A protein has these predicted regions:
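Positively charged n-region of N-terminal signal peptides that target proteins for export
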Residues: 1-4
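Bacterial N-terminal signal peptides
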Residues: 7-15
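N-terminal signal peptide c-region/cleavage motif recognized by signal peptidases
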Residues: 17-19
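N-terminal secretory/targeting leader peptides
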Residues: 23-116, 124-334
Length: 334
């Protein structure tokens, strides 16, 4: 796969050079792993629309949704090598390439709502996290929402004990590994595009995801129960190859930044509605029973997951966790 990515990067570099000399449009390949009708998919399409409009056709954005170009395990390497110019990976994806700080977003129950999230990502802390990406040959442009995660399986998930022994698909994140191990479950890292088949065939028993991801990937068709937990958050960081970005003419970069700002506002403004609509659509299919926890059951789940904070403190950074908790208004969790 690395050889294929290198070959693609060489072709992309040649194409960019050729385009520049012939005054053809600058091409931005924007790869992502979710469906076009998800919050991220719609934001990517909006960026394409605005980027091409504001640059008067000097930039052409090619959006590749649903892992049609690269799977989530491959896309960051493809970006670093220049085979694609832009991605919007989930926060979890940066840990495996050495930027573990982004895994703070994976901590269970660390974010009470999207308003609080905006305070973090739009403030100094969010800016510092984006700056960390420079060392990996990429520039962080924006934070995009998906939403809050729910748990699903073919058995009812009400109490912490219900998770024991079940195999759960996770993104590649040490925090998420710790989360499921704490519940007595077995975490299995798996590409997003492989989850439906893995659930269908029993390779894994359950998964965690947002309503929009569950619905657009049809996971509700192969899971008998979905429990409304809102225990964690899935968000994305829009990144661009740093060498490519820095090499753009200043006026083009300014117009693309403007397009990204507006696409971000557009996508984030409707992410909650997209998830609400997906939940209603799942209910209408009748293929998966939606379970709601009582306040007592919710509290039991929260307490069961709190040991994760201590377990990953040395990896994510206790000062960062403390600062994050202060920003979100949460009390330090012992």
């Amino acid at each position: 796969m690395r050889k294929l990515i290198l070959a693609a990067a060489s072709i992309a570099a040649w194409a960019v050079a050729g385009s520049a000399s012939a005054q053809s449009p600058i091409v931005i390949k924007f790869s992502h792993v979710v469906a076009s009708d998800t919050p991220k998919g719609k934001a990517a399409d909006k960026f394409k629309e605005l980027a091409e409009k504001y640059t008067n056709g000097k930039v052409k954005v090619e959006v590749y949704p649903n892992s049609t170009l690269y799977k989530d395990k491959e896309e960051l390497e493809a970006l670093q090598l220049g085979a694609v110019q832009m991605l919007a990976p989930s926060n979890s994806k940066f840990g495996p390439i050495g930027i573990k700080e982004f895994e703070v977003f994976d901590l269970p129950y660390i974010l009470p709502d999207l308003k609080t999230l905006r305070k973090v990502t739009g403030g100094p802390l969010g800016g510092r996290l984006l700056k960390l990406l420079d060392s990996k040959g990429m520039t962080g442009l924006a934070y995009w929402d998906n939403g809050f995660k729910q748990m699903s399986a073919n058995k009812k998930l009400i109490a912490p004990a219900d998770y024991k022994g079940l195999k759960f698909r996770i993104q590649s994140s040490k925090v998420l590994e710790a989360q499921f191990r704490t519940l007595g479950a077995i975490p299995q890292v798996m590409a997003f595009s492989e989850v439906y088949q893995a659930l269908q065939t029993g390779v894994v028993d359950g998964q965690e995801n947002t309503w929009s991801n569950i619905y657009t990937q049809k996971m509700h068709e192969v899971q008998k129960y979905i429990t409304t937990t809102n225990h964690g958050y899935i968000g994305y960081v829009v990144v661009v190859n740093k060498k490519f970005w820095d090499g753009l003419p200043a006026d083009i970069r300014d117009e693309l930044s403007k397009a990204m700002k507006e696409a971000t506002e557009f996508g984030n403004s409707q992410s909650a509605r997209e998830n609400d609509d997906a939940l209603e659509a799942i209910k209408k299919t009748g293929k998966s029973q939606i379970l709601t926890l009582t306040p007592e059951q919710d509290e039991a789940m929260r307490k069961a997951m709190m040991p994760v904070y201590k377990e990953v403190a040395s990896r994510v950074g206790q000062p960062l966790i403390d600062e994050f908790l202060k920003e979100t208004g949460r009390s330090p969790i012992n």
